[in-house]
Amino acid sequence: MFGMKRLLTALLAAALLFSLAACGAAAADTAKEKPNTKPVVVTTLFPAYDFARTIAGERCEVSLLVPPGTEAHSFEPTPRDLLRIADCDLLVANGGESEEWLETMLDGIDGEVPVLYMLACVDPLEEEEKEGMQDLHEEEHEDEIEYDEHVWTSPRNAMAICRAICDELCTIDADGAAYYRQNCDGYCAELEGLDAAFREIVAQGRLGCLIFADRFPVRYFVEEYGLDYYAAFPGCADDAEPSARTVAFLIDRVREEKVPAVFTIEYSNEKMADVICEDTGCGKLLFHSCHTLSAGDLARGETYLSLMWANTESVREALG
């Protein structure tokens, strides 16, 4: 499955590089006509966008490459997107398998684009397949390591990423260093408060286990707070129908652990969760991974902090 995805990614990248070369001259002319005095920061995912815009404030132009509501794992960049990357002063990306297209793009761009990878800011964790999970990798090589890319789901990881973004901004705009560091310190203080709230909730909870009737993009979160978990699929696996065995396993766990509610993640069809809830009488809760927001979420002013604070209440309820 992943071999075919990589082939398609490479073909797409080659086509886009050709388009980039063709559009280069026109882009240069446009840049000359409309000079920009602010540093330009391009981000690939919402967490990076939210962190960067908070720290950069009014001193930088910060934009999000993956449009709101778009599934980041299936994002296909356009020639215009590539020009944005080529012309930016800093690119904040996630890294990892889902952004392999980006490496090919960067290799084909004349000059060097400063890139900060969120995965490089923390100690990455491998995806794991726990008991009861649907096996989606039967045809893959056993020695192929896949890292969980959702590093920001740990607030402490978010702090490390923010400090790294701040350092990069200070490098490309030394005159604004004091401003960036002040913004970063203030934001990290808010993240400290979020982290403290999660720790208190976990310490006071009756249970020490979360059950996801869905994909599982929050391994960094459960590792941070010492929680056990069960889930239907590892990481942000491709859409797949759960087996009867997987559903039955999760139903048994809900009953044995006396779990008050199971989790779904954003943009899930929730069918499996509905089956489990109907069979066991448990509730259903949302854990927003903050990976992708809808246009409506952005219009309402949702942020990483607002979504994660909403998650605190869900975790409190799920732990009993």
Tell me what each language-model feature is.
Residues M1-L11:
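Bacterial N-terminal signal peptides that target proteins for export
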Residues L11-S19:
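Bacterial N-terminal signal peptides
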Residues C23-G320:
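Extracytoplasmic metal-acquisition and chelation regions
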